[in-house]
Curated annotation (Swiss-Prot):
This is Thiamine kinase. GO terms for biological process: thiamine diphosphate biosynthetic process; thiamine metabolic process. Gene3D superfamilies: 3.90.1200.10. It comes from the Bacteria. It comes from Salmonella paratyphi C (strain RKS4594). It catalyses: thiamine + ATP = thiamine phosphate + ADP + H(+). InterPro entries: Aminoglycoside_PTrfase (IPR002575), Kinase-like_dom_sf (IPR011009), Thiamine_kinase (IPR014093). Catalyzes the ATP-dependent phosphorylation of thiamine to thiamine phosphate. Is involved in thiamine salvage. It is an enzyme of class 2 (transferase).
Amino acid sequence: MRSNNNNPLTRDEILSRYFPQYRPAVAASQGLSGGSCIIAHDTHRVVLRRHHDPDAPPAHFLRHYRALSQLPASLAPRALFYTPGWMAVEYLHGVVNSALPDADELAALLYHLHQQPRFGWRIALSPLLAQYWSCCDPARRTPFWLRRLKQLQKNGEPRPLRLAPLHMDVHGDNIVLTSAGLRLIDWEYAGDGDIALELAAVWVEDERQHRQLANAYAACARIDARQLWRQIRLWHPWVIMLKAGWFEYRWRQTGEQQFIRLADETWRQLRMKG
């Protein structure tokens, strides 16, 4: 269901107009951010998500809805409703762990995603990194950051190994173990890109876990494991800069100390690796 109203509504207006029998439920943090909430009617729950990034165009939020609309139930929650500034999606009952699932299980889930039809829009990291630079706190801009950004832009993004629909925010809190298996939530960064970029961006604990995931995925996809790992490593500098820039971006938006701590730690990692 999609509304044609062009003026963003408040949460209370959304509830009274489109979900009159629903009320806000107990807040939950998994996969929710920026004013999103769970609403409930008796035992039925729905996730109401708000477009919370003031620097992102409305088209990006609509892409999020469209991605969910075309994905199968074996991968993601169903998209239920859209109006400018808001969407409602299925609430997935299950268990959310901060740790990633077993490498074989996660590889199978990602391979299943990458076998789906493409979304129709490409993920382009270079303009995204430039946006993070321009939108961050000016006091946080450093010569080191600018040098790394210019070097990546000069080199250009790696040539894709295989193009596929990507989730691009795979970590434990965005994976729900339902009665029917693993599902991914929080698809706001989804788009088409290199499968190795997806694997490079997974929030792993260390290189050992990363290699286990890469090897398991190579077995699923019948790709040479060494070739896949080389491609993942080509994307690694881009992903680290992406994470650092995103932390800076969120720090400027929210002022939350967790983001500045994460940004500082990511910059330390980059400097240690030269």
